[in-house]
């Protein structure tokens, strides 16, 4: 219910889809996403601003596809949507896309560059929906890349 005002249409599908995946109406959500990298002991650099409205498949379609072959899904299960990328470079959802396979490094706030994540980098993901002065925040997901043993 809380996200109802943030519903948006899914992108148009390039090819016909199976009947169990067909749906009508606004099934995606307009949720702003932000990803930052924070090198150890340094300030963070925001590297991506994306949005769940770019998801090619809605959450309902993803769940239907996941379970259609008999794979159970229960309360508390977690599944990943995959990379959420827009069409502009700053909306690309992976380091591989953002750096064009490591050929175009990202400039960090501290002046260093990143082609890929490095040991001790912290990745921070944030999400929120905002419309007409109403903001629903989802907080942060934070993880640090630890060196191999």
What is each model feature region?
Residues 1-74, 84-149:
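Catalytic-core "active-site belt" of small-molecule-metabolizing enzymes
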């Amino acid at each position: 219910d809380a996200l109802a005002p943030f519903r948006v249409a899914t992108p148009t599908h390039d090819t016909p889809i199976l009947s169990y995946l067909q749906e009508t109406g606004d099934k995606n959500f307009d949720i702003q996403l932000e990803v930052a990298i924070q090198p150890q002991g340094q300030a963070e650099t925001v590297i991506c601003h994306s949005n769940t409205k770019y998801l090619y498949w809605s959450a309902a379609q993803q769940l239907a596809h996941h379970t259609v072959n008999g794979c159970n899904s229960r309360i508390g299960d977690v599944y990943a949507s995959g990379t959420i990328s827009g069409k502009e470079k700053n909306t690309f959802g992976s380091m591989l896309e953002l750096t064009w396979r490591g050929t175009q490094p990202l400039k960090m706030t501290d002046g260093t560059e990143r082609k890929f994540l490095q040991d001790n980098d912290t990745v921070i993901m944030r999400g929120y929906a905002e419309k007409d002065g109403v903001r629903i925040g989802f907080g942060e997901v934070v993880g640090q890349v630890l060196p191999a043993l």
